[in-house]
Amino acid sequence: NIFDILGLEDKMDSVIGDIRDLEHLKKVFDEVQPEYVIHMASQPIVRDSYDRPVYTYETNVMGTVNIMECVRLSNSVKSFLNVTTDKVYDNKEQDKGYVETDFLDGYDPYSNSKSCSELVTHSYKKSFLNALPVSSKCRKCNRWRRFCKRQNSS
């Protein structure tokens, strides 16, 4: 994976765990004292979200709440980034890309849970983290995946 290819393990602290476990996350934040937090954890499969909606919401929404709570309680975090998906937008089948002012929608459990994750991030930013220089969202899209596939097949 790209994490290994870039040798990031030697350049940063990375912890594998369950973001639904707030107590474990608190211990990790206490031990690591992170300055930058990039939240990419999720239940990422749309089809699975229909079969396991509770797990999807627990992971994508409450997992984000847990991470944001750890950021709120931390004195070390300088920046937080929540990486979500373009699936958060109301899909109007247009030929143009989405922009930040487009409406959130997310009618299936996965998409809706990621929209909720963004709302959690926004709420924590406005309610608790105004002093944090950066607390934002980044929406990945499948165009990046298609680009990578094209590059690998060349």
Model-derived segments and spans:
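N-terminal Rossmann-like NAD(P)+-binding domain of SDR-like oxidoreductases, especially those catalyzing
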Residues: 1-139, 144
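Amphipathic alpha-helical segments in well-structured domains
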Residues: 64, 152-154
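Conserved loop-to-helix N-cap of the C-terminal "lid" that shapes the substrate pocket in Rossmann-like
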Residues: 135, 149-151
